[in-house]
Amino acid sequence: MQSSRGARAADVPVRLVVDIGNTSTTLAIFTGDEEPSVESVPSALFADSSTMREVFGNMARKHGEPQAIAICSVVPSATAVGSALLESLFSVPVLTICCKLRFPFRLDYATPHTFGADRLALCAWSRHLFSEKPVIAVDIGTAITFDVLDTVGNYRGGLIMPGIDMMAGALHSRTAQLPQVRIDRPESLLGRSTTECIKSGVFWGVVKQIGGLVDAIRGDLVRDFGESTVEVIVTGGNSRIIVPEIGPVSVIDELAVLRGSDLLLRMNMP
């Protein structure tokens, strides 16, 4: 892995970022410094090349053909398929977000090849936003991840735990009678039916886990490294329902991984 904190990001008029997740894939067109134009499709669609050609073609007709493309993927089987498809469509090399790139932070990790592309992108964007402050980056998605950077941009470590839907799904799939429940904010702490009890248990359990871990990490940064102000950035599909319950957060941005991928794309262009 490389660190290049002073590296400049290239200015490319039209850039495409494809964020391939376990459930859904988000496509973002970045034009200059404007807010990206974003669309989402089921990740399973990557098995249908004709449909994806149509999706990418429509985006290109609407926004112009991309001059630079990045894939941020946590699904290895879809990474190669997506990269080949995009290169054949636009005749542009596709950058895959991985540990071999230049970063605005220093990744000190025992197994860098296992560090998820989404986590790399989120760390990059977190460092970009808070270049001289420690930051806790939390992604509340299929899995919930925590990654920590110190004041000078050193990676201090992280945590990974099951996400909301994974917890609810496990209760259903690993038991004989518990139903599958869609999790949203319960009306009260205690449930009065099995469905309500599952919803309350998963939702408030995740809230307390995330809030407690953020507080514990903040305490470690203050005690062990002498940090004073610790920033917290939160992203992920379930971030909006959780963040109001967990205390002070510096930034909530569901597009943070896309923005970080775009930053890394511009930093790593030849």
UniProtKB/Swiss-Prot annotation:
Its EC number is 2.7.1.33. Pathway: Cofactor biosynthesis; coenzyme A biosynthesis; CoA from (R)-pantothenate: step 1/5. A monovalent cation. Ammonium or potassium. It catalyses: (R)-pantothenate + ATP = (R)-4'-phosphopantothenate + ADP + H(+). It holds the Pfam family Pan_kinase. CDD domains: ASKHA_NBD_PanK-III. The keyword ATP-binding applies. This is Type III pantothenate kinase. GO terms for biological process: coenzyme A biosynthetic process. GO terms for cellular component: cytoplasm. Keywords: ATP-binding, Coenzyme A biosynthesis, Cytoplasm, Kinase, Metal-binding, Nucleotide-binding, Potassium, Transferase. Catalyzes the phosphorylation of pantothenate (Pan), the first step in CoA biosynthesis. It comes from Chlorobaculum tepidum (strain ATCC 49652 / DSM 12025 / NBRC 103806 / TLS) (Chlorobium tepidum). K(+) binds at residue 139. The lineage of its organism: Bacteria, Pseudomonadati, Chlorobiota, Chlorobiia, Chlorobiales. It is an enzyme of class 2 (transferase). Its cofactor is NH4(+); K(+). Substrate binds at residues 109, 116-119, 194. Homodimer.
